[in-house]
Structure formats: structure tokens, C-alpha cells
Design a protein with these regions (language model features):
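Transmembrane helix-loop boundary segments of multi-pass membrane transporters
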Residues: 1, 19, 78-101, 114-119, ...
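Intrinsically disordered, low-complexity non-transmembrane regions of multi-pass membrane transporters
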Residues: 50-58, 170-198
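Helix-loop-helix junctions within the multi-pass membrane cores of secondary transporters/permeases
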Residues: 27-104
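Membrane-helix cytosolic exit motif
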Residues: 151, 155-180
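Small-residue-rich segments of transmembrane alpha-helices in multi-pass membrane proteins
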Residues: 62, 67-74, 120-136, 185-193
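A cytosolic-side transmembrane-helix exit/cap motif
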Residues: 4-9, 108-120, 170-179
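Transmembrane alpha-helix boundary signature
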Residues: 2-12, 38-43
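Hydrophobic alpha-helical transmembrane segments in multi-pass integral membrane proteins
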Residues: 2, 77-78, 128-145
């Protein structure tokens, strides 16, 4: 199924876009494919539902799905940029993982755990069987070195959810703190308004 279906199709689409005379289209088209390919990963659906159940709805499946889709979208966009420019993958991977590690100091451990699980889930069968051949097809059509320019897309897809999920957690935590502060202020105002009669 993989050899007859996804891999050749991915390679043909990648090569076709690269050969059309507007190679820069690889970036936006790749990002759109990356955004929607997350929905085709079976493990993603299992993970998002489990996270929603374990967190008692605090982290919804929709939030998780969106964060993962955005992460993969960005990673595929960067991978296509690399194919067009030949920039080393290390310029993205090292700062990306450093940033992900820094975020672990400021984000709740539950979000950190979810983020690191999500990295493995997002880089599942669809990434290996469609996105990688897509990148290889584009790279070959542009005359690039497949061994250096096309590879690294799976590593990028595994890295970006670490950042996007933890960023989602950080924003959620900030919202919760702001909500608590607002409630505290309202409670103080109510206490000030109470009149006591002897």
C-alpha cells in the first residue's frame, strides 16, 4: 500500500510543484499539506482524546489538534525553505530544541509530558510515507542533494510540536492566572461593599 500509494504520489506531487516554474510554491503548498496531514495520523486522534479525558477537559482535543497542526505546518514550511535554499537543518534543529528545553522551566509538567509525546505521534506513518517522498521529489526536481537537503523533515516534524504544545500550555497558564486575579479583585470589591448593622 505504501509503495503503491503514498510514496509515489508524494514524490510526483513534490516534483510536479518544483518543476512548474514557481518553485517557491513548495513553501505554502507544503505548509497546507502539513497542516491537514495531522488529521490523517491515527495516533493523533487517540492522543488528543486521551489528553482531553486525563485533563478533565482542561486541554481539549481541538486545542491539541490545532497546536499539532500548526507545529507540523511550520516544520514543513521550514523543510521546503531548506530545499530551496540549501540551509543546514542544524540551524533550525539546535535552536528549536534549546527553545523547547527552556520552555520546560516555565510550563506545567503535564504540558511538557504531552508535548514530548506529541512529537513522536506527529512524526508518524503519514510523515514517513508522504511528506518525506514529497520533499525528496521536490529536491530531485530542483537538482538538490537528496541526502542533505530533503532529509531532516521528520526531525523537524518531531521538534515543532514540542514548542507549539508547550506554548499552548504557557498561554493557558497565563489565562488561568489572569482569571484567578480577576476573581480575587472581584471578591475584594464585594467585601468592601458589605455593610454591617449593629
Amino acid at each position: 500500500g505504501v509503495n503503491v500509494g503514498f510514496m509515489p504520489v508524494g514524490q510526483i506531487i513534490g516534483a510536479g510543484i518544483a518543476d512548474c516554474g514557481y518553485a517557491w510554491l513548495l513553501i505554502p503548498i507544503g505548509m497546507v499539506i502539513g497542516y491537514f496531514i495531522v488529521a490523517a495520523e491515527p495516533a493523533v486522534h487517540v492522543l488528543t482524546k486521551q489528553v482531553e479525558e486525563i485533563s478533565n477537559g482542561f486541554v481539549t482535543a481541538k486545542m491539541m489538534q490545532t497546536a499539532l497542526s500548526v507545529g507540523v505546518c511550520i516544520s514543513v514550511g521550514i523543510a521546503m525553505l531548506r530545499i530551496l535554499t540549501g540551509i543546514s537543518v542544524l540551524w533550525f534543529l539546535i535552536p528549536g530544541y534549546v527553545f523547547a528545553l527552556v520552555l520546560t522551566r516555565y510550563v506545567s509538567p503535564i504540558f511538557t509530558g504531552i508535548a514530548y509525546d506529541s512529537g513522536g505521534v506527529a512524526s508518524g506513518p503519514m510523515t514517513a510515507t508522504f511528506l518525506l517522498p514529497f520533499a525528496m521529489g521536490a529536491c530531485e526536481a530542483l537538482g538538490g542533494n537528496v541526502m542533505t537537503d530533503a532529509f531532516g523533515i521528520v526531525a523537524m516534524v518531531a521538534m515543532t510540536p514540542l514548542i507549539t504544545i508547550q506554548m499552548m500550555g504557557f498561554i493557558t497558564q497565563m489565562k488561568e492566572k489572569a482569571k484567578r486575579r480577576y476573581i480575587e479583585v472581584q471578591m475584594h470589591q464585594l467585601e468592601d461593599d458589605i455593610l454591617y448593622f449593629d
